[in-house]
Curated annotation (Swiss-Prot):
Pfam name, any one: ADH_zinc_N
Full protein name: Cinnamyl alcohol dehydrogenase 3
Enzyme class at the top of the EC tree: oxidoreductase
PANTHER family: ALDEHYDE REDUCTASE
Length: 375
């Protein structure tokens, strides 16, 4: 009889971040669970940071991936929202306490006991592994319905990148009045989605970048209204005080002062890029211009479902490069160089093939340790 708990994926075993085949176990499908056969999984920049331990809290082995689209193959007896055969998604979080102030406000992403899809532990102590694998078992409250008309492959990155830009647009008032001016700093995996969603909300969008390399693409294909090169001092001077909002997606070290100068009085800058080192925060421009700096971390489950419906309605998807699982390490190398337009997505179902040289991951919940062995 086939072991229904067996799973297969690609894991990083140390800070080199090199991914290799792994066999491991998923928990049995419980009464509140949905088992998902993974079809596609997006490659997020945070996957790269985590497998290389850039943030200092990685626990190996790690199977990354939190932009998952697949098919429900089993549902628990208490699950009424989903049925076998449904197309579903799993994003950045797969658990929370369900009782704190944040959870009661549909902000599970800010729950102090939030459980992430990978490099995290569930309440029973088991290590969670992500979507660079063939199957995942998730509490139904953290499973999303993929709307008709939203492609499985190019829709997958919306489960992280999409909600990461959608949520702050709603919270910081960017959607209340069309015609407001939004600056998007950085045109990468987050930035190109921010342009599309911003335009769908009726904003006038300016892409802010260090070079003019992507100018025509940003305007002609992505729909941006204008393009501002930060190294062009004359254009930067002309743009002072013209923007109501800026979404800063850049995860590399950069100066905030030039961005503050672009904001109108009472303008808002929302930082989304997760940097390894803190940025300098100039206070004078904030005080003298009543300007605001804020942050945002993905979104709750209700808002994420809302975002998916919004993107389906407006035909918003990520621009992707579809890759095989065996190409993941070279894709990570390219991601470091920003050599992708604009998101890698792994064709899991058609390329994840077991190998006889793979390792077995055995998890010992009682002691909270993992032991690997060859087979």
């Amino acid at each position: 009889m086939v072991d229904q708990n067996r799973a297969f994926g690609w894991a990083a075993n140390d800070e080199s971040g090199v991914l290799s085949p792994f066999h491991f176990s998923r928990r049995e499908n419980g009464e509140n669970d949905v088992t998902v056969k993974i079809l596609f999984c997006g490659v997020c920049h945070s996957d790269l940071h985590t497998i290389k331990n850039h943030w200092g809290f990685s626990r190996y082995p790690i199977i990354p991936g939190h932009e998952i689209v697949g098919i429900a193959t089993k549902v628990g007896k208490n699950v009424t929202k989903f049925k076998e055969g449904d197309r579903v998604g799993v994003g950045v979080i797969i658990g929370s306490c369900q009782s704190c102030e944040s959870c009661n406000q549909d902000l599970e992403n800010y729950c102090p006991k939030v459980v992430f899809t990978y490099n995290s532990r569930s309440s029973d102590g088991t290590r969670n592994q992500g979507g660079y694998s063939d199957v995942i078992v998730v509490d139904h409250r953290f499973v999303l319905s993929i709307p008709d008309g939203l492609p499985s492959d190019s829709g997958a990155p919306l489960l992280c990148a999409g909600i990461t830009v959608y949520s702050p647009m709603k919270y910081y008032g960017m959607t209340k009045e069309s015609g407001k001016r939004l600056g998007v700093n950085g045109l990468g995996g987050l930035g190109h989605i921010a342009v599309k969603i911003g335009k769908a909300f009726g904003l006038r969008v300016t892409v802010i970048s260090r070079s003019s390399e992507k100018e025509r693409e940003a305007i002609d294909r992505l729909g941006a209204d204008s393009f501002l090169v930060t190294t062009d001092s004359q254009k930067m001077k002309e743009a002072v005080g013209t923007m109501d909002f800026i979404i800063d997606t850049v995860s590399a070290e950069h100066a905030l002062l030039p961005l503050f100068s672009l904001l109108k009085v009472s303008g808002k800058l929302v930082a989304l890029g997760l940097l390894e080192k803190p940025l300098d925060l100039p206070i004078f421009p904030l005080v003298l211009g009543r300007k605001m700096v804020g942050g945002s971390q993905i979104g709750g489950m209700k808002e994420t479902q809302e975002m998916l419906e919004f993107c389906a309605k407006h035909k918003i998807v990520s621009d992707i490069e579809l890759i095989k699982m065996s190409d993941i390490n070279s894709a990570m190398d390219r991601l470091v160089k920003s050599d992708v337009r604009y998101r890698f997505v792994i064709d899991v179902a058609n390329s994840l093939l077991p190998e006889s040289s793979a390792e077995i991951l055995t998890e010992h919940v009682d002691h909270g340790v993992s032991i690997t062995s060859r087979f």
